[in-house]
Amino acid sequence: MSVTKKDVAYIAELARLKFGDTEMETMTVELNNILHYIDKLNEVDTEGVQPLSSIHDESNVLRADIEKTSISTDQVLLNAPDRQDRFFKVPKVIG
């Protein structure tokens, strides 16, 4: 498969890009080089190779969801340099 300047112009339009003549030529050559490189994958012998969707056997390995005791809000707020009611008070950062 090869890419023409018309293909690159169409892709550029979809991506809302504008290329000059030199850039259009460069992009056409580069995309053709990339596709040629990717096409080499068709030469790989995959006979007898099982398809896989991940290199890892396990998926979504999560720790057990165990309820633990934690410190109270009042204890947390004891470490706050400044507070208002039950909240940390911080300097305003948005004008």
Curated annotation (Swiss-Prot):
EC number: 6.3.5.-
Enzymatic reactions: L-glutamyl-tRNA(Gln) + L-glutamine + ATP + H2O = L-glutaminyl-tRNA(Gln) + L-glutamate + ADP + phosphate + H(+); L-aspartyl-tRNA(Asn) + L-glutamine + ATP + H2O = L-asparaginyl-tRNA(Asn) + L-glutamate + ADP + phosphate + 2 H(+)
Pfam families, per database record: GatC (PF02686)
The entry's keywords: ATP-binding, Ligase, Nucleotide-binding, Protein biosynthesis
Keyword Ubl conjugation on entry: no
InterPro entries per UniProt: Asp/Glu-ADT_sf_sub_c, GatC
GO molecular function: asparaginyl-tRNA synthase (glutamine-hydrolyzing) activity; ATP binding; glutaminyl-tRNA synthase (glutamine-hydrolyzing) activity
GO biological process: glutaminyl-tRNAGln biosynthesis via transamidation; regulation of translational fidelity; translation
Enzyme class of the recorded protein, top EC level: ligase
Domain of life assignment: Bacteria
Function: Allows the formation of correctly charged Asn-tRNA(Asn) or Gln-tRNA(Gln) through the transamidation of misacylated Asp-tRNA(Asn) or Glu-tRNA(Gln) in organisms which lack either or both of asparaginyl-tRNA or glutaminyl-tRNA synthetases. The reaction takes place in the presence of glutamine and ATP through an activated phospho-Asp-tRNA(Asn) or phospho-Glu-tRNA(Gln).
Similarity comment: family membership: Belongs to the GatC family.
Subunit structure: Heterotrimer of A, B and C subunits.
Protein name: Aspartyl/glutamyl-tRNA(Asn/Gln) amidotransferase subunit C
Gene: gatC
